[in-house]
Every structure is written in structure tokens, then in C-alpha cells.
Swiss-Prot record:
SUPFAM superfamilies: Glyoxalase/Bleomycin resistance protein/Dihydroxybiphenyl dioxygenase. It comes from Xenopus laevis. This is Glyoxalase domain-containing protein 5. PANTHER family: GLYOXALASE DOMAIN-CONTAINING PROTEIN 5 (PTHR21366:SF14), GLYOXALASE FAMILY PROTEIN (PTHR21366). It comes from the Eukaryota.
Length: 160
């Protein structure tokens, strides 16, 4: 199997400043986990209401009045369209994300809650493959039409 850097060099034009990375060597570090991601949204209030009331996340405010949604040891930082913070993605676009969120709550309970909240289920429950094993998932959309997958690991030892 070829290293990612070598695959990139064959399939895409690699910027010249990355040419030193194109050897078979690995970086001198290892990524451990995702700390946060950024969603660009059309309306902060609608997004916060959805993620807190429908998905049970906690709304937080940090530096300079910025908004985030916390869950577990991760968070989702929110940027409002046209008011993004720098640095930002090249093309910050509402509705372009596809997120998989893990819960220990049985999906039957999740589905019942989604129905009470009036949130349509796009698909599921269906079997999928998560980062560390098999999962069962339901799919829904947030107010910006991002695809949200809520999942249970099939084995209890894969929960964290």
C-alpha cells in the first residue's frame, strides 16, 4: 500500500512546498482525536436551538462572543455566513457537512424523540461501518441541510 503523500502525487498536482513530504517516511507525530470542527450556518439561533433541543448538545460562548456546541470532549464551533472568523475554510458553505455522532442511547429512543420534535428521518436505521466497528445509524438534516448521522456501536466495547 502506498503512503498517502505518494498517492496524492500521482492523482493531483501537489504544491511544490509539499515535495519534501513525498517520501515513504511518516510524520514525526500522530493525530490523537478531533477536538472541534466548524460549521458555517445561515442562522445561529436556529442552529443552536436544533442542536440543543433535538441532539442534546450544550450551547457555549467563548472568546469574543463566539458560539459553539459542546458534547463529550468535542465541540462544534459555529460561524455565521458572511461573519466567519479568520482563518476559515476556503469555501465556507452552509449545508456542506456530513457528520456522524455516536450515542449510547438506543436508536429506538432517538427515533421517537426525532418524531416528537418533527424532524424527518432521511434513512435508517441502517447498518454502517464506523471508525472502530459496525454501527447502526439514522440520518437526518439540520436547519442548513447538513447530513447528520446518529449512531450506536453494535459492540459495547466501542462506545468511546
Amino acid at each position: 500500500m502506498l503512503p498517502l503523500c505518494r498517492l496524492l502525487s500521482r492523482r493531483a498536482q501537489v504544491p511544490s512546498h509539499l515535495s519534501r513530504c513525498l517520501s515513504d517516511s511518516r510524520p514525526p507525530f500522530r493525530i490523537q482525536r478531533l477536538d472541534h470542527l466548524v460549521l458555517t450556518v445561515r442562522n445561529l439561533d436556529k442552529t443552536i436551538k436544533f442542536y440543543t433541543k433535538v441532539l442534546g448538545m450544550e450551547a457555549t460562548t467563548f472568546k469574543g462572543g463566539r458560539k459553539a456546541l459542546s458534547f463529550g470532549i468535542q465541540k462544534i464551533n459555529l460561524h455565521e455566513t458572511g461573519k466567519e472568523f479568520e482563518p476559515k475554510a476556503s469555501l465556507p458553505t452552509p449545508g456542506s457537512a456530513d457528520l456522524c455522532l455516536i450515542t449510547e442511547t438506543p436508536l429506538t429512543t432517538v427515533v421517537q424523540h426525532l418524531k416528537v420534535c418533527g424532524v424527518p428521518i432521511e434513512e435508517g436505521p441502517v447498518s454502517r461501518t464506523g471508525a472502530v466497528g459496525e454501527i447502526t445509524s439514522v440520518y437526518l438534516r439540520d436547519p442548513d441541510h447538513n447530513l447528520i448521522e446518529v449512531s450506536n456501536y453494535e459492540s459495547n466495547d466501542k462506545k468511546n
